[in-house]
Amino acid sequence: VYVSSAHIPEALRPVVLEKWPYTVPAVAQLLRNGLVLRRSLTFLVGDNGSGKSTIVEAIAEGFGLDSQGGRAAALRGRPDPVKTELGKVLRLRTTSAGAAMLSGPRLKKRGFFLRAETAFSMTEQLGGVPGYWAADTSRMSHGEGFTEVFGTMMRNPGFYVLDEPESALSFTTCLQLVALMHQIAQRGAQVVCATHSPILAATPGADIIELGEHGMRRTTWHDLQLVVHWRRYLTDPDIYLRHLLATGDDRHDDVTQ
């Protein structure tokens, strides 16, 4: 691996903890205990607002990756963007391989950050830019564009941070990304991924960390609440839908309303 852990040094700890993002249980736990990255593949899995995107974005920033998505900010001809609140104080412990990569030329850094909020525009803006992909993704569907980006940017060992990459992917293309992540991890890459996808989280050999009101905890794929709920829903959708959808004959009798 390139990064062995993430932590907030004592000297950088915020004085006021009653404000975002430190009110998020997972971030509060990161502040107290840090986060150890034990394997080549790490998935942070949790609901909206659980802090997974906040944490992976700060990890990307800590490795010198563009917080808007991509490689290094200098490749776009602009200065480094202002870091996020967590990114300002988060520090990474790197292995010798990670330290060597960080100390090398920016153009030689083998790393990439896919940020969910900017991913669609990024795929179009960076096509043809040296160091990125040559294909014109504006002529592709979002899913095809994402697949092109992953296949180009994640072909060699490096440090890859992904924020909800499944957002534009079908079931089939999610499986393709699983295969790609598994392959590059076996070749020496490290991937840290925030996801809602039970498909991606099932990638063999991954370390799965579940985020929620409890903070962060390691778990297995079968025990993820995400997986439990998807199984129940696919077995019998009515278990969930009957609590969400209004029922009653008055909704169906008068077709003129």
Predicted feature descriptions by range:
Residues 110, 156-159, 185-192:
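Loop/turn-to-beta-strand initiation segments
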Residues 40-74:
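Phosphate-binding glycine-rich loops of NTP-binding sites
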Residues 29-39, 153-155, 183:
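Phosphate-binding P-loop
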Residues 140-164, 172-184:
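GG-anchored amphipathic helix commonly corresponding to the ABC/SMC/Rad50 NBD signature/C-loop
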Residues 65-99:
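Flexible phosphate/Mg2+-sensing switch loops adjacent to catalytic phosphate-binding sites
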Residues 172-190, 197-257:
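C-terminal lobe/lid and adjacent interdomain/linker elements of RecA-like ASCE P-loop ATPase modules
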Residues 1-32:
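N-terminal pre-Walker A segment at the start of P-loop NTPase domains
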